[in-house]
Amino acid sequence: MKAVVLCGGRGERLMPMTDRRPAALLRLCGKEILLFTLEMLGKAGFEEAVLAVGYGSEQVERLLDEKYSGKIKLHIINTAGKSTVQAVRTAMCDETEILAVECNCICTHPLDEIIKVHLSHDTFCTALTYDTENKPAGIYIVKRELFESLNPEKHTDMTEDIIPEAVKSGEAVLLDGKGYYKRITTPEAFLDCQRHMLYNENMSQRLTENNFSGAAIGEPVYIGENVSVMSGSIIESGSVIDNNAVVKGGKVNGYVGIGS
């Protein structure tokens, strides 16, 4: 089974964070969301993935050239201007079924478990849900037949339209997600996810007295590469100081991000 990563959205509700980059390239504790997604697919054993790009496609390709070192064979297609339904259908190419991940989701649920559940049910779709109202998350397996049974012109969004309709008609099953999940569609959601990573996912850079002499640095914090923190600076817990940033004797309040 191939994977499809939907990473062409601009992230309008994330503005101004997405003024100069697509939402998939926002950095959580020094790593782009897209790289977290590919890492998740790699752990699940996926060997091929199609990246459906749009806004900022050149930036996505540059990131992959410079930073991606995983073993998944990647194919890039441009689905700019298409709905999520159209993007998934296009990215499926000749595949009969695929696992799709909308690249604004950070999730710790094992993907191989989703595949096992899907294979045990004779349905067109299996989707994760973390919602008490059973709203689908942005991770799902779909068969080609799903689009043949529903009107793609009437339904344009996978999680808002297609999957709920398929659940009602008995053509899809929902799987209760385990672990952490966050759909990053607002600055508040972004900060919540970053906070979770710092405190629960061992993303914090642990510091010793000799790292930045004369600076008061709380924990946990993330400090990237080639960062200068001058004597007298104060960095409170939960902060992210990304690559190449310089802090000169100032105070960085908790949960503030500086840098790339």
Model-identified regions with their sequence ranges:
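A generic "binding-loop/recognition-motif" signal
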Residues: 10, 21, 56, 180
